Amino acid sequence: MPEPNLCRHCFSVLEEGETVCSACGQKPEAPNPDAALPLGTVLSGQYRVGMVLHHNDLLTTYLGWDTEKDRKVQVEEFFPGILKRAEDGRGIMLISAESKTLFRTMASDLHDRWKRLMEVNHKAMLKTLVLFSENDTLYRVTEYLRMEPLEEYLSRQKGEMSLTDARQLISPLISLLSQLHNMGLTHCGISPQNIYVDSRKRVILDGFALPELRTVGNGLHAELYAGYSAPEQYSKALWQGEWTDIYSLGAVLYRMLAGQAPVSAELRGERDDYLAPLGKLHPDLPEHVCEGIMKALSVDHKQRYRSMEAFSAALLEEAGANTAVFRPEAPPRPTEKPAAAG
């Protein structure tokens, strides 16, 4: 059976004579950005590169096509800001030779993190299909699911979400983060931009990176999320840990229930805090839910919950009930690590 005529950008089937893809709106001749791999590049002899989905100072993420299994995939390329594209359009070059050690260190840390993520089997995370090295850099291929960012999903809700719906969306994320934390891994990029929802309300957490990308002053242009990144992420002198993810998840819940994002952590202080209490914005919410979310959003990380299980128990427990909606058994915690340690 002949291969259908696919759009070079999004791999949707093009109808005969179609000059602009009806799915993504791109013309076949339109190229990828200069710093990205060219459209049609085949990696590992199997994965064809399509459009750029996201780019930051650490990774370039592409939509890909698995030529062996005829399916869409997601391809992440380690391409930090200290690199530029080689003349052949595929390889990489250091902008400055002085960055060689930094590149090697980040590559090693990223490879280790990706290998750890391969150990995770959870419905709220994209499954890693393969890791490989090519073009003098690293690649990770994951499954691809057609979903929309939570940010867009919430904008269509036209205001706050019900507590029942918020719990339905957040419970799988609490379960996933509990598993990651028990492995000694944190996300530190939780926001409505990195959470995805499908038509059946399945939720996925994506946007995994290195701590260097999630901390100001750590060698990369930090990719933080106003209102969702924790105060400690705005200084490399402060410690990050489970409590950082708890802050961000609390901020996501605040957005869901209040209908507005929390004020940025940069504008908050322990004395002068401009964050409106959730109970004042939504007085119909149960008091213990409001208190739980506001505790998670404490400026001082020592005042927050110290584990996802504790946050879950306080937040998801029905008033007067003896059991929580989600309360997994947790093994002993790994030793806390500073932000720069990964």
Please name every model-derived segment.
Residues 87-119:
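AlphaC helix of the eukaryotic protein kinase fold
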Residues 131:
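Activation-segment/catalytic-loop signature of the eukaryotic protein kinase fold
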Residues 135-149:
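Conserved short submotifs of the Hanks-type protein kinase catalytic core
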Residues 150-161:
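AlphaC helix of the protein kinase catalytic domain
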Residues 169-170:
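Activation segment signature within eukaryotic-like protein kinase domains
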Residues 173-185:
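Protein kinase catalytic-loop region centered on the HRD/HxD motif
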Residues 232-242:
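Conserved end of the kinase activation segment
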Residues 304:
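Conserved HRD-motif arginine in the catalytic loop of eukaryotic-like protein kinases
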